Amino acid sequence: MRQFVIDGKTVSDDSPAYVTAEIGHNHGHDIEKAVAMIKSAAGVGADAVKFQTRSPKHTYQASTDRGAFYCRSDNPQWMDQVYGIHREKLEFSWDEWVAVRDEARKEGITFFSTPFDFPSLELLEKLGVPAYKVASGDATNIPLIKAIAETGKPTIISTGGCNIEEVDQLYESFKRINADPKDLAILQCSCVYPATDEAMN
């Protein structure tokens, strides 16, 4: 029987659905909002809350040119900012991440995150997250996938936009390092927002 184990909970064909509340960056770097989202997710019975973790200085070019990399937003908080600066303002400090993790523990809900780069993976390791999620955009980022596999932790990888050869490559790259079948879940992902009913499982 196929099984995936995350934070001590087994997910299989015979188990109830594992529900993850995707918080991402919807907190807008507001710790009180993040805490409220965690409480809400726990209150409705979600199994986990998932965030996104980036190190914008390692991910985005520090360009000040107006144009494609500028935020176009009606929100005065973000209007006319370089995208990298905008992303940086969304990131929590170490102390804030600790507060987020501790709040999830207090509420009895699993906390994990999607690392978008190596510094973020290192930060999440220090926080002691029990699992990782890889975004579709990084499904072909084999160095990052290998680094995550080396943690020995359960990993969920979305494959939106990938062809079957790329899915095979990420699978083989992960399994060469972490061969435990209970540590890898691959999601078929439709990169259409919002997805039509016909595109969903």
Region roles according to the model:
Residues 1-201:
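Catalytic cores and adjacent flexible loops of soluble metabolic enzymes
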